[in-house]
Structures are given as C-alpha cells and as structure tokens.
Regions:
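Active-site nucleophile elbow and catalytic-triad environment of alpha/beta-hydrolase enzymes
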Residues: 128-146
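Short alpha-helix in the alpha/beta-hydrolase fold that links the catalytic acid
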Residues: 4-10, 142-143, 152, 166-175
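C-terminal alpha-helix
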Residues: 207-218
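Conserved alpha/beta-hydrolase "acid-adjacent" motif
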Residues: 3-4, 83, 109, 139, ...
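Acidic catalytic loop of the alpha/beta-hydrolase fold
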Residues: 137, 160-165, 193-194
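Catalytic histidine-centered segment of alpha/beta-hydrolase-like enzymes
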Residues: 190-203
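Short beta-strand/loop motif that positions the catalytic acidic residue
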Residues: 149-151, 155-158, 162
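Alpha/beta-hydrolase-fold enzymes
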Residues: 2-107
Length: 218
C-alpha cells in the first residue's frame, strides 16, 4: 500500500469526477507552477496530498460498509474504480530516488497516458479489497512490516535502471529482512520487466540459480 500510494494522483478532487483536479498538484498539467526539477517542499506537499486522498477513499469505504451493516447486509460488496493511479513525481523527475531510468517514463509506458487510462494495478476494487491492498492505515500487505518476520534465506534482486521500483524500495526491503542470511544483487542496466532485454532477464535468472545452489536449495 505504500508504493500504491506513492503512485496515486494527489491532484484528484472528486473521486466521482476525476477530471476535477487541483492544478498546482497536477504533475501533468503544463499550467502547474511546480515543474521538474521539483523542490523538496513540493514533494512533501504532494506526498501529503496522496496520503490524504487515500484516507478519503478509506473513510468512504468504511462508511459504505457500515451502511450495509446497518441494513443487515454484512456480507454485501460494492465495486468501484480508483482513477489516476500513475502519478509519482519521480516518473518525471529522475533526480528523485535516482537510478538509471529515463524521464517521463514508467514501467507501463508514458506515465501521463497510463494515469488517464483504465489500466493499472489494483484499479478495480471492492470495498474490502481496498482495505486489504490500498488503505494507508488498514492494509496489511506491507513488505517492510512483513519482511522482519521472514526466517528463510533471502535473495533480493534490484535493477539499476528500474522504471517501477526505485533504489530506496529495494534497499529498504533488504534492510527490513530480520536476519543475516540475505543477499542483495543488482542487474546493471536492467529495467523493471526486462522489456527488450532478454540478456538481463537471463542474468537475473542465472543469479537466482547460482544463489539457490549456494544455499543448497536445488
């Protein structure tokens, strides 16, 4: 849920009309006075807006579930769409959590196009799936929190040109693993899904194979 929230468009004012956006938070609006390279102050304000939007949706979800419960429909569900979910400033400003990725690009393509499209991770939600995977305060799908409980050997692979998961995510996950039998390897020049990079995909697979052999797991 942390990563999802980092991608959430903080400019959306009305969930029922995502065309209504706050211009000074809309990173894709040319009229936004805040343009790359972004100031630390803007990033702080924007991150707060993303969390605020997440919590606003969570409050609506909780109200909806309570409404059903009062009517005697405790198991009732309700589907909805989370609009504009690919608006992380780091897609436009590669100086944020820098690596070798190119600007104005993300792991799904041109970020503005993806943000306005019906595609994307976890766009289609039920009330309970929102609480499970999206909610900033209720979701338990949290890699950093769960990693400390891992007891088996771990290999973490990062890609140096990753256009989806930036270095802090990889490093933080590795550091969160609560034991010493862990290793962090990097695939130089690799993007998130190894698109157009079969040699990088093979390198990653061979890295996994070698580690599994070292651990006597195969």
């Amino acid at each position: 849920h942390r990563t999802f929230t980092e991608w959430l468009d903080g400019s959306v004012i009305d969930e029922n009309n995502p065309e209504l956006r706050q211009i000074d938070l809309d990173i894709y609006d040319a009229n936004n006075p805040n343009q790359p390279k972004y100031t630390s102050n803007f990033i702080e304000i924007y991150r707060d807006a993303q969390i605020s939007r997440n919590r606003k949706i969570t409050n609506w979800v909780l109200d909806k579930l309570q409404e059903f419960k009062k009517k005697g429909y405790e198991n009732r569900e309700y589907g909805f769409v989370v609009h504009r979910t690919m608006a992380d400033p780091k897609w436009l400003d590669p100086s944020i959590d820098p690596n070798g990725r190119k600007p104005n690009w993300c792991f799904l393509g041109e970020p503005e196009v993806v943000n306005n499209s019906p595609i994307g991770l976890a766009r289609y939600c039920s009330l309970r799936s929102w609480l499970s995977q999206w909610s900033y305060d209720y979701a338990r799908g949290d890699g950093l929190s769960c990693a400390k409980d891992i007891t088996v050997p771990c290999l973490v692979i990062g890609n140096t040109d990753d256009d989806g998961i930036t270095p802090s995510h990889t490093n933080n996950l590795f550091e969160a693993i609560g034991h010493s039998n862990k290793r962090l390897d990097w695939i130089e020049g690799a993007n998130h899904y190894y698109f157009g990079q079969p040699e990088k995909s093979n390198e990653s697979a061979q890295t996994c194979k070698a580690w599994l052999n070292e651990q006597r797991l195969i």
